[in-house]
Amino acid sequence: QGTWTASVADKLYGKFYTFQIQHNGKWLDETPGVWAKAVGTNGRRAAIIDFATTNPNGWENDKGPKIGSIADVIIYEMHHRDFSIDSVSGITNKGKFLALTEEGTKSSLGEKTGIDHLKELGINHVHILPSYDYASVDESKLETNQYNWGYDPVNYNVPDGSYSTDPYNPAVRIKEFKQM
């Protein structure tokens, strides 16, 4: 019956929280809430972070690309993991948001890879498959080969930790997503 809010004067950075709702006399599972913007591993708990610390250098001056004519737009659809995971991609941050920030990468055959390859093709816009926090990849077991396109959302407002270099730190996934 509406939206409930609460405010706390203290800076509780580094703390986590969940909500638990009782519906028709039954307690439902704990949830980080639909408006969570930062979460812990696997999105089970909302995190309180200082979002200013997630801004990469120059973030406040970042501008979107200018589009002259829609006819000049060349779009490439991609998945974070697929784009960079190959063992000969020459990309350091394979399967991560940061893979899309690496320049000068080459395959073992000397061919351009990553962003440089897209530029070489004339691509000027990228459509990235779901980046939000989703259920099917266990962020605490990234050494295990897991894969999903991300169409099983958990937290729509939070980048998925499996694409970050540290899924245990809620701020890292946000900062690396912004860097991308």
Where are the regions a protein language model picked out?
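Carboxylate/His-rich catalytic cores and anion/metal-binding grooves
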Residues: 118-145
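Generic recognition of stable, solvent-exposed alpha-helical segments in well-folded globular domains
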Residues: 109-113, 126-127, 172-179
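Short amphipathic alpha-helices and their capping/turn segments at secondary-structure boundaries
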Residues: 61-68, 114-122
